[in-house]
């Protein structure tokens, strides 16, 4: 793997940030648990998905949102991997709506 100077923000028009958002209840405030990569405009986007029969709700939301082949942002969370959580679809959509603001 080759590291690119500037990382994910090396290409012009991209920015990124990470923070502690408390995605997982009780997590340490020092632990970053949410990151976002943002493009100034719609950019070509693609994803590789699991072949498992059981997929977390965010996978289905991502599949739907990437149907056009473009995106302006990517949200990454850490510390919350329960694929069978109740209301997962609603929570994933709410995260997308919050990020869009």
Predicted regions and their residues:
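N-terminal amphipathic/basic leader segments beginning at the initiator methionine
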Residues: 1-50
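Short glycine/serine/threonine-biased micro-segments
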Residues: 16, 71, 77
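Histidine (H) residue identity feature
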Residues: 20, 65, 89-91
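Generic structural signal for well-ordered, non-membrane alpha-helical segments
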Residues: 29, 52, 59, 88-92, ...
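Broad gene-expression machinery/nucleic-acid interaction feature
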Residues: 31-33, 56, 73
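Active-site-flanking structural segment that lines cofactor/substrate pockets
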Residues: 37-70
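Alpha-helical support elements that line or immediately flank enzyme active sites
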Residues: 75-101
């Amino acid at each position: 793997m080759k590291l690119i100077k500037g990382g994910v923000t090396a290409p012009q028009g991209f920015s990124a940030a990470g923070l502690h958002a408390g995605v997982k209840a009780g997590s340490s405030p020092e632990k970053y648990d949410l990151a976002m990569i943002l493009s100034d405009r719609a950019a070509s986007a693609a994803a590789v998905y699991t072949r498992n029969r059981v997929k977390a709700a965010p996978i289905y939301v991502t599949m739907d949102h990437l149907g056009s082949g473009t995106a302006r942002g990517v949200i990454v969370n850490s510390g919350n991997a329960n694929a069978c959580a109740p209301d997962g679809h609603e929570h994933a959509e709410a995260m997308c709506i919050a990020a869009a603001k």
